[in-house]
Amino acid sequence: GHYDKYVERGIPVDEKFALSISELTMEDWILTFKLDITHPIAILIERTIAKLKKQGNYNITDIISSLEKDEKSDNQTKNAATGLFEAADTWGVFEREGQDPTKIKDLINAGTTTVLDLSVYNSVGAFNVRALVISLVSRKIFNQRMDERKKEEIAAISKGLDYFSEQEQKENPLVWIFIDEAHEFLPKEGKTIATDALVQVLREGRQ
């Protein structure tokens, strides 16, 4: 969403960045929109996302269309929910129609430092977009590394080798994640959308 603006201003950039909206969970949206789980808007969003996930990949346009067609909620609730997703569409963080979302393998290369500039995304005010991005990227990096670790252990066992002494180059190596102002996403009280993902990385990420 901000790539073209950077190019126009002569700011060095390498690749576009875009998240797949279908990877967000119901809890992600509740935390992002700061809703109570029992609020009518949250209930409508939960029902809508659950239905769309059964269909596979979807985008914001699909979400808005499904919200508008909901027969269980009143117009005021549907308009409010639709407005939230129309706002999300302006964040410049989700893939557009015809655009492929960023893959984790594009961000991770052994011996290479990848900088993901989140300064263009809002972290204060109504929506914490930076926390949303950090949550999804951290979660995907962690899950990919866990899957790779299982493959490495199975391969080591099949070779009759000690997994921990094996020094082969890993296809998906261990990743160091450095987050500027990380305390903003791990508050002493309460939580952000990034809190659970970061806590999991802190507890289990050494693998």
Regions found by a protein language model. Name each.
Residues G1-R203:
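P-loop NTPase motor domains
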Residues R206:
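Anion (oxyanion) recognition and catalysis
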